[in-house]
């Protein structure tokens, strides 16, 4: 099934605004659905299109670019003939799928866009690492957009719950709690989202099977194996570090502080030694990094301390499968026990990861904050996330605490508010209960994160 994705509207906006003057690059992790959505877009929005999958390493196609880039009439004739597609000026699109596999095609975008006859859509993965850009000039005629796993809203669409999403958004705008039955329904749907995740194939299997978890876990494990295989192809000098961080993500997130303690990975190691590691993980979009903001203000990035980092899995459904033994396939019944709260597991790990995933999908860069009290000899403030680019109050920051249980204190967030009162637009606690306002803090259920 072809899933409805928000990125489709971004592609439409690009097509209407660029009028052939810029190509668009869709970046995203493997198996995120890049190829599917761009081909669906080309099919609906153009009279004809060619999709070139450079991962197939077709020597004939590569030779066309090597021989005819200076003779574009010949290049287009060869491509049209080879793929059996009639290209129509200003009414056809050419898709460069997995363009990182043939960087010369990406470099050619400069000349192809200048020619102006066709629109160009690229998809890429790991497009910024040195191996994929060292011999080319990255074209300025290229606009880049990120594609993520399905967010909760897209997951709800896939299950036919558009009206529920509209109701959730309406309640958030009015600062009203959902009707109890609707809240329970939304929480049940959200738990399904945590377990299945947002990777298109597992979601499609879940929907098509009538919400059966059979096959979902196996599909997720196939994706995890693909990620591990990609890591094993990295240059030897930092392969082991990437693998160490990747393997430790579930363990790190199950701890109280959740941040990476580098000396526990290898004795005597420190953050600077892992800069390439996190660059690879970030560029692959396998994980979402959250850095310490040492002095929370509107310009959060100005006070970013990369020596302190939390590393979340890019997809929470994958995190769940990754947290169990790789060779131990989770039966559908296990998923149902988790869904119905009959099997105990670290919900805090999953909740914080899924909130990170949803914030990133909304365009936020992730930051956290801690304050160590010399008097108490411990952290007396711990803020899980801070965001700043809210459209209504864009010059303020918004601290977020994530609570997986229904009973909790607000001490940490209250202290943070007292310390940085003038800089804060609104403070949020994300909890499993319905919407309520507590001590001037807006407490919202996790599904309302789509509104932040």
Residue ranges: model-predicted function:
Residues 34:
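Conserved lysine of the Walker
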Residues 15-25, 31, 40, 44, ...:
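A cross-kingdom feature that marks ATP-driven nucleic-acid transaction machinery
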Residues 56-89:
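Short glycine-rich substrate-engagement loop in P-loop NTPases that contacts/grips substrate
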Residues 95, 119-125, 146, 155:
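Structural recognition of the conserved hydrophobic beta-strand(s) that form the central parallel beta-sheet
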Residues 43-61:
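Conserved catalytic segments around the Walker B and adjacent sensor/switch elements
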Residues 160-351, 365:
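Interdomain hinge/linker elements that couple catalytic modules in large macromolecular machines
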Residues 111, 128-144, 156-161:
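Short regulatory helix/loop adjacent to the ATP-binding pocket of P-loop NTPases
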Residues 2-18:
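Pre-Walker A adenine-sensing motif
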